[in-house]
């Protein structure tokens, strides 16, 4: 029997619907971030840097890019015979088989995988947060308190606390109450979605939860309240570093912009805590004499002939002469043609912005199609789409994946409008 002290179960099956067109064809953890990474790289790198060498990645929604990205885990030193990284998708069994119904059910369906390593502890992680954390220190805290469960928490502003699961604790950190998105929170200690459980205890509760017909099979809504109700030893591990849930267009854009601030809140260049990812086979970036670059991240394989200010260019982005990019994210292998102007926009992979096109101008009007998603003044262009020359695109505009010139009924797309491939929303 292979014995591991602690293994990780990384939840990476979420759609991330609040990211709109960015997650239409890809799971949220596989969305590009920070000039060369995908969001899941941060949790995987935390595991590597914390000495965790066995990780089960639980996938479900649109897993193709995520699976290809992780591969056999080599960038994270997880291409191992004993342990390493394993992709765990829903599958049919002789007696049953179904989609993961919730976070707890996803882990329950993989009890056999966990039992294979007979761990003392299991850490449950979300694959869609941006942060750097040493899980070994959290494990030490768990052991010192003889805990059944330890939940990592972070202080959030009071006005934002109702968006999170809130832990109410004694002064020593022992949890006495958990509130899921309370209207009137009693504290500001928000769950980060990072849990360490003593495996024998968690295993028992997963089985009980699966047998409960009215459970939604969720850690926050079912497992944690059940353990608290039974008087289990549960502790809050307070984290004080950078942590972002990039689950909305605004949060995603702001977190990327944090990387190019004068003094970045989140340091990607820390040699003591590297963020690992598969490296693209591309040459060094090229900055032409006609270019002007200020406060920006320029990845491998980029060619810059225009102006780039306070922006992020992913590998293979091509910025032609006269083009101006400001406060924007240009993802891999996209091209911005001559004299185009882009402001406060997210341009997905392999998109083309035509000559003299202008994006991100006009009044800040919420999107008519999905006002709760595109409402922060940021225009989003889907992958493999093409913006025609001379087009003027307003704020909070959504350009669908694969949209082209034939899908534009007008070259003037006003703020809050959308352009769909084929002209019709799916």
Swiss-Prot record:
Q: Which InterPro entries match?
A: ADP-Glc_PPase, ADP_Glu_pyroP_CS, GlgC_bac, GlmU/GlgC-like_hexapep, NTP_transferase_dom, Nucleotide-diphossugar_trans, Trimer_LpxA-like_sf
Write the Enzyme Commission number(s) for this entry.
2.7.7.27
- MF term (GO), any: ATP binding
What pathway or pathways are given for this protein in its record?
Glycan biosynthesis; glycogen biosynthesis
Entry-linked PANTHER family:
GLUCOSE-1-PHOSPHATE ADENYLYLTRANSFERASE (PTHR43523:SF2), GLUCOSE-1-PHOSPHATE ADENYLYLTRANSFERASE-RELATED (PTHR43523)
Q: What does this protein do?
A: Involved in the biosynthesis of ADP-glucose, a building block required for the elongation reactions to produce glycogen. Catalyzes the reaction between ATP and alpha-D-glucose 1-phosphate (G1P) to produce pyrophosphate and ADP-Glc.
Q: Which family does it belong to?
A: Belongs to the bacterial/plant glucose-1-phosphate adenylyltransferase family.
Instruction: Extract the NCBIfam families matched here.
Output: glgC, PRK05293.1
**Record's subunit section:** Homotetramer.
- This chain's protein is named Glucose-1-phosphate adenylyltransferase
**Species assigned in the record:** Ruminiclostridium cellulolyticum (strain ATCC 35319 / DSM 5812 / JCM 6584 / H10)
